[in-house]
C-alpha cells in the first residue's frame, strides 16, 4: 500500500496522496500532506504549534526499515500530544505521559490509535494516560493474549514469561512475539510457574467496569484478537525471511531457559539417560564444542555407547573454517564425555567430564546433578578439540603439496604476466613520448629558424631605410641651394647681360674710330687719339655702373685696338670701310649718349 487511502489533505485538498501524512493531535480530523506540513500551513482552527503525528504507508516503512527486524504494520515512533516531543514507543509514551503530564486534562487525539492500521484515527480523549494504560499497555503480559488468559488460569497454567528469556534471541519489538500457553507449560517446571499478575487483573476489572458491561469487554477482546492475529502474521513473515538452519540450535544468550524444550531425552539404563550423553554405569557421550563465532551450541554429534567404563568412545567432530579442512578425532576413557552433559528423568544423572571439562546436568521432572572431575594429566588431553592438528597420510600430503605447488605456480605466472604487460606498456609509452618529443623539437627548431630569418630581413630593411634617409638628407641641401640659385637668376638677367655686352662693344668700336681720325687730321695733337682711346665715355660708365660687374669682352676690346690701327694703316681700303662702320657706330653711340644720367 503506497497511498493513504480515504485520506485527503485539508490544505491542498489532495486525496489518496503519497508520502508522509501528518495528523494533528489537537484538531479533530485534520490531516496534511508532506508539502503542506513543510510549508507551515495554518487555518482558523489549526496552528503551527499543534503537535503532529507522522504516519507512513506500508511501502515507505518497508523502504525505510526494510533491513531491520521491525514490524511493518505500526509506526516506529509516536509524538506526545502535550509537549510535541517525538520518538516515543507505546510503552515509553505511557511512561512519559504518566511522569510529566499527570495533571493535564486537554482533549487530544490518540497518536497510537491514529497510527495503527486498524485503529480509530480520530479518537479524542481527555484522559490520555488512562487511555494508554487500558488500550495500549503491552508490558510483560504481552506473551499471553486476553482471549487465552481465562482458559490458562482455569487449567492452572497461567504463565507469563519474560520476553528477554524466551528462545530465539532477545525481543526487538512486541510484534515479533507469538506465543501459546502450551509452550509455556512445557517449558517451565511447576516450581518456576508464576502467579497471575494482580495489577493486570485489577486493570482488566477496572476496564470492564469503566466500559460499562460485557459488550465493551467483548469489543476489547475482539480488538486484542485482531492485534494478536496481526502479530502472528508479522512473526510468520519474519520467520520466513530468516535463513534456514539444518539443525536446531540453542543460543547461549538464552541459556537460562529450559533446555528440555530443545533437547529431546530418551530412556537409558540405570545410570541415567539424555539426548547428549547416554550409557550404563556412569554414562558417556560426546558433543560438539561451542562455535566461537556464533556462540551457539550445535547438537550434531555421533555417539557410541560402551558396555563398561573402560570402553573407548570415538566421536567425529567437523568444524568449518575459512580455507582449511579440520578433521578432529577424540577419544576418552573411564566413562567420560567431552562436555559431560547428561539429562536424567525422574532420577539422578551423573556426568563425568573429561580432563579439564565441566559437567552440566538439567532435569525436567525432578532434580539433576552434574559434576566435573579432572583427568590423569592436563598434558594428555586438550581443552579445545577443534584446534587439534589433523593427521594426513602420505598420499593426502602429496595431494596437498601438489595443490599448493599448482597455486604457487599459477600465482607466479600471473604475476609475471602482469609485470610483462606493465613493462610492454611502459616501453610503448616511452617510445610514444620520445617520438612526440622529437616532433616537438623539430617544430620548435623550425619556428626558431623562421623567427631568425624574419629578424634578419627586418634588420636589412631597417638599414636600407636608414641609408636612403641619409642620402636624402645629404641631397636636400644641394637641391635647396640649386633652387635658391635658380630663384636668384632669372631669364631677364641673361637678356640684360647680353644687352650690356652689345652696348659696350659698340662704344668700344666708336672710341677706337674717333681716336684714329684725330691722329690723321691734326698733327698738333698727336696724342689725341691715344687720349681719346684711353678715356671711357659716359655711356659706358653708366652701363657699367648699372651692371655692377665688368663686361666679359672689355679686355678683348682693349687688346684689339692696336691691331685695328695696324690694319688701317696697312690696308687703306679696309680702313675706309672700317671708318664708315665706326662712323655709323659713333652716330648710334651719340644717340645713346644723349640720354641724361639721372643718377
From Swiss-Prot:
GO biological process terms, alphabetically, are: negative regulation of ERK1 and ERK2 cascade; positive regulation of proteasomal ubiquitin-dependent protein catabolic process; synaptic signaling
Catalytic activity as recorded in UniProt: S-ubiquitinyl-[E2 ubiquitin-conjugating enzyme]-L-cysteine + [acceptor protein]-L-lysine = [E2 ubiquitin-conjugating enzyme]-L-cysteine + N(6)-ubiquitinyl-[acceptor protein]-L-lysine
PROSITE patterns xref list = ZF_ZZ_1, ZF_ZZ_2
Q: Which residues does the annotation say bind Zn(2+) 2?
A: 24, 27, 46, 50
Positions of Zn(2+) 1 binding = 9, 12, 33, 36
* Chain intervals with Low complexity compositional bias: 160-170, 180-192, 559-593
Q: Which GO terms describe its molecular function?
A: ubiquitin protein ligase activity; zinc ion binding
Q: Where is the composition biased (Gly residues)?
A: 269-285, 513-532
Recite the UniProt keywords alphabetically: Metal-binding, Transferase, Ubl conjugation pathway, Zinc, Zinc-finger
Q: What ranges of residues constitute the C2H2-type zinc fingers? A: 78-101
Query: Keyword Lipid biosynthesis, does the record have it?
Result: no
In this chain, the stretch annotated as Disordered covers 155-193, 229-253, 269-294, 466-486, 507-599
- Composition bias, kind Basic and acidic residues: at what positions? 538-547
Zn finger regions (ZZ-type) covering which residues? 4-60
Per the record, the domain of life is Eukaryota
Q: Which residues form a coiled coil?
A: none
Q: Which PANTHER family match?
A: E3 UBIQUITIN-PROTEIN LIGASE KCMF1
Describe its partners and assembly state: Interacts with poe.
What is the role of the protein in this entry? Has intrinsic E3 ubiquitin ligase activity and promotes ubiquitination. Involved in the negative regulation of the Ras/MAPK signaling pathway in the wing by acting with the E2 enzyme Unc6 and the putative E3 ligases poe and Ufd4 to mediate the ubiquitination and proteasomal degradation of rl/MAPK.
Indicate the family of this protein. Answer: Belongs to the KCMF1 family.
What's this protein's name?
Answer: E3 ubiquitin-protein ligase Kcmf1
Species annotation = Drosophila melanogaster
Q: Which gene encodes it?
A: Kcmf1
